[in-house]
Amino acid sequence: MAHAHADADRLARVTLSRTIEPGDLRVTGLVSELGADKILGYLEAAADVESHWGFALAQELGRVDPAEVLEQAAAQGIRFIVPGDTEWPTQLGALRNTGALHDRGGEPVGLWVRGVHDLRQFACNAVAVVGSRSATSYGTEQATELSRDLAAMGHTVVSGLAYGVDQAAHRGALVAGGPTIAVLPGGVDRPYPAAHAQLLEAIAERGLVVSEAPPGAGPTRTRFLARNRIVAGLAEGTVVVEGAVRSGAINTAHWTTNLHRPLMGVPGPVSSVASTGVNQLIRLGQASMVTNAQDVITDVMTHAARSVAGGAEQLDESFVPGPVRSTQRAVPSPAAGVSAPLR
């Protein structure tokens, strides 16, 4: 019976993934609370559901054959994972409690994945490196070197495959022979931008390509915004390398802050428009200044150690860096007269 329920839930999530925009909080929140099968049944039966979504949602739901969708995806080397799967990164569950930005939010109903590696294992030691699409030579160099060194030190680099800083981050990780995760705004079978098709294939072969949007889906503005929360949600912390005040990188930074995870920034020239956003984050104390991979690792480990020592929340140990896990049992409890470190 439990197996049948799990199958029904997975198929319902496939149907929702094919019909509902990624990060639609009206759905993601309810699915997390009540389950996908129950919410799908409501959407199929509700007479006034069209007035809330603005299109004939019930008809769209009825056109989806989820088993066929999974079969077609598998033929392309694409799998669909959902909360509760052993491969599901449990840290994404924190997105249930972070509200919304630009009407996007919540834990994904599922993720479409390309690549042979295990997403949960890759994400347990991940750092997001994001920044301007119109990166300067300075930004490209900093993103490449930072990501190369992070990967060489055993960290997975998460980014969005965009022009500029994103592609530099992926390339830096690949040069080091390390893991990288590309989170796309459209289907994992659709390289965006098209000029990065070869890079996408390299990541699919040596890393992982992930999307909340189903195979075949194209990128849209709302899907870019939804994608940013997945980038932040997968990572232990986020580094911004260049980014204007209003940019996708700063949106990802806001998600990181909402998740109470370390936000870091590589400072840029005061004369560079590309660095106005990240420089402002640093000036306002919203991001710590980092200049190399060791700075990043120190910030991430310090944050994790404080969270464990302070008991702020029950952390999934797979998400805490190994050096912190190995020492947390030696941390005296508050009953022993040792207070938590100051934030």
Feature-to-residue mapping (PLM):
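Glycine-biased, small-residue-rich flexible motifs in mid-sequence functional cores and linkers
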Residues: 1-8, 21, 84-343
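Short, small/acidic-rich helices and loops at N termini and domain boundaries
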Residues: 1-95, 284
